[in-house]
């Protein structure tokens, strides 16, 4: 009888402690392989996901918000943690070219699987990877009945830095990313482009950026609050013309949001966190990928001694290009880039980019003959493709143009988008622009 009573009491205690155990699982930590960086992730009492980062006993990022807002609902609160999953990887991979041949990819991973407690009970996973010299995280929208096609209207991602460190940044401009770099405290910044290079203290340098941007809007950040002397940066994405930020369909993954962490500024140059967060190269045979220096016909246009458009000062002529090819061959340059060779420059090309033709050369420019001449000298032309921002016109000619260049033995193309907008309405760094750049890469 007494044994039965104790058994019942034990069961009651177990059930009483079960909610506490479940609450304890609403937060977890993951450390880098050496243990020097530790990331904590979880959800608060309102079900809002967050993360923080420490280096040893030093706080780098205070609890910072995570999540998304959609056109038909919110994915930034009312969550519970379904489970935490862990993984680790330690591998070496080889670059076709770069500062070093072999790169070590060593990290510990924590996946926080979330489900909303009410309403549609949508699911969202957040994957964290912690390296010895930085960390990254991304959002994963799993396949689910309650989420098919969706539109992101705001990304709630924040980086809440300890203190108000100084940073080198480029100001955000919807048309061009060509401002001047400035150094100032984060609290004094407006909306800025990434990367954001941060000097927190003499032995703490960081770089905030993104990785694996394939079908998403480009990341910018801006300070949204300074509380207790700590600055909070929030993600600001480049929109479509109608205000949408990202158009997607589950299953779907976001780019990585990343922070490299170094003791010295120079360490940011050799930091490989961003490279390691990108997908492995999809090109199986990379033996043909080589580096090379080039010269070209373009600076004389800016000096106003020659012109892009045909006329008495036309720079892209057969005779002039041969001079550059001879110079390149004599001085060890592998390529010659020629601007103004193709039809379209005779128009107001900043407004009429849709009139560019990427296979038809001006009469005074022997395109195929010049490439044969260059090859005989151990040099090659680089095809210059200025679009004037007319992305659709370029996409419609990609197959024909690239087939011609390949047939001629041209191995490199330099594209251009000199315009505030793409196709007269979309920002170059929006999802629209990112999708276009991917089409060009894949066609090449």
Language-model features, listed with the residues they occupy:
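Bacterial Sec-dependent N-terminal signal peptides
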Residues: 1-27
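Intrinsically disordered, low-complexity acidic regions
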Residues: 240-242, 283, 322, 334-344, ...
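N-terminal accessory beta-strand-rich subdomains and adjacent acidic, glycine-rich linkers
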Residues: 27-284
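Conserved, mostly hydrophobic/aromatic
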Residues: 139, 328, 416
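Aromatic- and carboxylate-enriched substrate-binding clefts and catalytic-loop regions
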Residues: 339-444
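Short, flexible loop/turn elements at secondary-structure junctions
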Residues: 116, 130-132, 163, 262, ...
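An acidic-aromatic substrate-binding cleft motif
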Residues: 249-327, 331, 335
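Generic recognition of flexible, low-complexity loop/linker segments
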Residues: 125-126, 244-247, 323-325, 401, ...
